[in-house]
């Protein structure tokens, strides 16, 4: 019940028992490959090298789920109003506000531009929190969403239509950029798209849970 049928088929073919590049270290601990080294699993960094099927199966096990693309964007872009029960009409360009797009503006707010030479602690960069208090929505790792990669309303292909148009509906959306993403490129609407079986060094995920509004 934890796995999608296609995801379970992938797991059987790949003989996947754990995230790629993980190595068992005794009975209850793990190590992982980090460039050309073997290190203890960093428990306070994002999980990487997991595909969409694995992320979705974990969410089912944890009784949580992946956010949809629009949920991710609302969490990054909007501000609370009416005592936190509604969204304001204000939309931010970056989770922390409208100041960004360069090294200086993101230096204390996001792990971008390769500065960390890899992932950093999930508690780092508090100055980059969204209006809802959500941390590291930009940088560190690309985050899987539950949504298929589809065109925005009014989409028109430019001269590079072969870049995205042929794969609409066949990829899953990731949001947020990774530690190697250039700060001049990333903002709250920046998208990426991977095949659901791709286990990428720059890809991870965050989970969400249903919330009952009062």
Residue ranges and their predicted role:
Residues 191-196:
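Short, P/G- and charge-enriched loop/turn segments at secondary-structure junctions
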Residues 168, 197-199:
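A generic structural micro-feature
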Residues 201-214:
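Short, structured beta-strand segments at or near domain termini in extracellular proteins/domains
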């Amino acid at each position: 019940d934890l796995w999608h049928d296609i995801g379970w088929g992938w797991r059987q073919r790949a003989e996947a028992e754990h995230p790629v590049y993980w190595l068992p270290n005794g009975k209850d601990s793990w190590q992982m490959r980090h460039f050309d080294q073997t290190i203890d699993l960093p428990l306070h960094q994002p999980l990487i090298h997991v595909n969409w099927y694995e992320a979705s199966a974990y969410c089912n096990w944890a009784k949580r789920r992946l956010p949809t693309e629009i949920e991710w964007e609302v969490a990054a872009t909007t501000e609370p109003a009416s005592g936190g029960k509604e969204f304001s009409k204000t939309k931010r360009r970056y989770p922390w506000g409208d100041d960004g797009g360069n090294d200086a503006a993101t230096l204390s707010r996001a792990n971008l531009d390769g500065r960390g030479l890899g992932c950093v602690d999930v508690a780092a960069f508090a100055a980059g929190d969204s209006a809802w208090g959500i941390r590291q929505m930009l940088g560190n790792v690309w985050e899987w969403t539950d949504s298929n990669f589809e065109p925005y309303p009014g989409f028109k292909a430019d001269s590079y239509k072969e870049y995205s148009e042929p794969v609409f509906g066949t990829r899953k959306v990731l949001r947020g950029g990774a530690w190697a993403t250039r700060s001049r490129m990333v903002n709250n609407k920046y998208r990426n798209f991977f095949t659901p079986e791709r286990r990428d060094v720059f890809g991870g995920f965050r989970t969400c849970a249903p919330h009952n509004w009062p």
